[in-house]
Regions:
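Loop-rich non-cytosolic ectodomains and luminal regions
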Residues: 1-4, 8-231
C-alpha cells in the first residue's frame, strides 16, 4: 500500500533501501508509480524568512484530522495555531515526554514532538485534531503561523492524510504539488513512472512528483533526485 511521502523519506526507509538493493541484482529493473497525490491539496512546502502563514480549509463533518509539520532539527520556530473562530494558541516544541494536549474552540489537539532517528535530519511535529465537543472538529479556515527563532535552513513542510482519508473540501489553500511523491517511488534506483493525460497532451495533474533543488536539504531534494523518471 502506498502512502504519502514524509520529509524524511529521501530514499533511506527500509522499503526503499530494499528496492535499491534488489535493483542491483542481475538485470533487474524495478518500476514504481509516483502516486495520485499531485492534485489532492494535502501538501505544502515553504522556506521561512520572517513570518510564515499557512491557511488550511477544513470542510464540514470532519471527525478527525492530522497534520504533519516537518522541519530541520537545527531550526527553531515559534508556532501558533489559530482556529476558525479566532481563538489561538502557541505550540510548545520543548515539552518533557514529547506530547501534550490543548483545546481550541470545540477541537482537542494532541501534539506529538518527534525525536531524532537514524538517517533523519528532520523533526516531525504531529497534530491530531479530534472533537472536544460534539462529533466533528471545527470547520472553516485554520491558520498556522511560523516565526523563526533560530534559522539554519528555514525549510518546512506540511502534510495532510492521503486524499481518501479526508473530505474534498479539506486542504491547503496554496498547496505545493512538487512534494507529492509516495513511497516507494522515492527510492533512488527504481524507475518512477508518472501519469500522462492524453486528452490534454500533458502531465496528469493528479500524478505525484518531486523536485531536485540544491537549496533544499530535506526529502527527495536531499538525494539530488527529480521524479518521476518517466511519464
Amino acid at each position: 500500500r502506498q502512502r504519502q511521502m514524509c520529509i524524511r523519506d529521501s530514499g533511506s526507509s527500509l522499503l526503499e533501501r530494499f528496492l535499491d538493493n534488489a535493483s542491483e541484482i542481475g538485470r533487474t529493473v524495478i518500476c514504481v508509480g509516483s502516486g495520485n497525490e499531485g492534485a489532492a491539496r494535502g501538501h505544502f512546502a515553504g522556506n521561512i524568512t520572517r513570518d510564515g502563514r499557512v491557511e488550511l480549509a477544513v470542510g464540514n463533518y470532519e471527525r478527525n484530522l492530522n497534520i504533519q509539520l516537518w522541519k530541520n532539527y537545527s531550526d527553531v520556530f515559534r508556532i501558533r495555531l489559530q482556529a476558525p473562530g479566532g481563538e489561538e494558541a502557541e505550540l510548545s516544541t520543548n515539552i518533557q515526554g514529547g506530547k501534550y494536549t490543548l483545546e481550541l474552540e470545540q477541537t482537542r489537539i494532541l501534539v506529538y514532538l518527534g525525536e531524532p532517528l537514524p538517517y533523519a535530519v528532520a523533526q516531525e511535529i504531529y497534530l491530531d485534531m479530534i472533537p472536544a465537543e460534539g462529533s466533528y472538529i471545527n470547520a472553516g479556515i485554520w491558520t498556522i503561523r511560523l516565526e523563526p527563532v533560530v534559522t539554519v535552513t528555514g525549510q518546512y513542510y506540511l502534510y495532510l492524510p492521503a486524499g481518501s482519508g479526508i473530505g474534498e473540501s479539506t486542504g491547503f489553500y496554496r498547496a505545493t504539488p512538487q512534494v507529492t511523491l509516495t513511497i516507494p517511488s522515492t527510492a533512488a534506483k527504481v524507475i518512477t513512472v508518472g501519469a500522462y493525460d492524453q486528452v490534454y497532451d500533458t502531465y496528469a495533474d493528479f500524478s505525484g512528483r518531486g523536485y531536485a533543488d540544491s537549496t533544499r536539504t530535506i526529502g527527495v531534494a536531499a538525494a539530488g533526485l527529480t521524479k518521476p523518471d518517466l511519464v
